[in-house]
Amino acid sequence: MVTKPNGNWRMCVDYRNINSACPKDTYPLPNIDRLVDGAVDHKIMSFLDAYSGYNQISMHPRDKEKTAFMTADANYYYEVMSFDLKNAGATYQRLMDKIFKGLIGRAVEVYVDDIVMKSDSFEQHLNDLDEVFKALKGVNMKLNPEKCTFGVEGGKFLGFIFTHRGIKANPEKCQAILNMRSPNSVKEVQQLLGRLTALSRFVPRLAERTRPMVQLLRKGKIFAWDDRCEEIFKRFKEFLASPAVIQKPRPDHLILVYLAVSEEAVSAALVQETEGKERSVYFVS
């Protein structure tokens, strides 16, 4: 049993054996950047969360016994889908795509169990909500009112923060790096690089700046966190204390690409001009 952030309990089952034997469902998940760009920059939004969403999908009768697990009192199996199963995410996404067919892209963006609604007016948002509720009712999908937010100007979606100014990095991800001490092992460097990579859209010249840290991961190399690595680490912390706000790309605006090329890395900054000012859209390296 694992404690949830709200204090409730979540039961987890070790399905590593059945997952390793189960063929992978190759149903494609949406591109996160496209979903984020499609959802931001709307006047009114709602964020929806299904009530134990995975458990609202029934298991196929012949597969129920495959989910069996033992307790001190008896053996049990799942009547509904467990989130621990290998193809649970793909199955959930397939269902969402069917439920919201015709709404995705126009009024809704969905990534597995993350759902955001977007509208350009309050009246339109009411109409969109009506369509979404009818679609959910049609398959008897229930929402969790405690985790839903309606009629707001911004919020968090897929680890990004939507505001009237544009797209912000998740403060929790930034704070996780700010709270880190200087790495003392290869594992801690890997953890730092993983967290920086998760924020790569907001960080210019990431590959070039992290190269001294990446070199510490080479096999056979003696670990030595030197002054150069420490200085880079401090600069990342200074930057992430107040990260840049980026905007969604606008198809009717010219995209400018600025390249930074060195012997060690190639980086690019995508910008567009808005109201006479160049605004960052994306950093790639």
Which positions does each model-derived feature cover?
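Retroelement reverse transcriptase polymerase core
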Residues: M1-S285
